[in-house]
Amino acid sequence: MQIGIDLGATKIESVLLDDKGIELHRNRKESPKNYKETIISITDTVNNIEKKFKKGLNVGVCHPGSTNLDTGEIQNSYNSPWLNDMKFSVDISKSLNRKVLCENDANCFALSESFDGSAQHYKIVFGIILGSGCGGGLIIDKKILVGPNAFAGEWGHIPIGSSNSKNNIEQYISGKGLERLYFSKFKKKLVAKEIFKKAREKSTNDMEFIK
């Protein structure tokens, strides 16, 4: 059995799989908004699973941002800024008293699809995540293409317009981007989930905004 943790800006989702990849347990809870509490929350999640099943399981965590290849610190975590400049892999491994494998969330998603998902028959796979942010992972021959700056595949941060533009795709189509645009237009703060809920309820303004 093994435990997978998806650390996002708004939630921590955990899953326990058996040796055949069959799901045995799943849980979701709100993400803390600081680094110390994030480490504690993930540790508690793993401990609670192991109390019910088995201790000493393998643990993997996918997270926003990338890991600096020289320092081992997380970088470019725009929607969970408390992770930046932290040696997350070291700290969570120490907290759980075992080696914990950590990787960018979009890379993990794309890699998983390349092995046993909808992209398993393809040599080159590009996976896209649309959540609080806008991420991408590039897989070639079932290996993650990291790039010299650990930023390969991150299409959400491609500038829009001139090369000096500070605008990028994530500012428009991610959850956080939609929230900023919504506030700019209506002067009302709503999270992305609420915006889509109102649109589904046929709110004219919200339907037009989503379009």
Name each region found by the language model.
Residues D18, H63, I140-D141:
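A cytosolic small-molecule/anion-sensing beta-strand core signal
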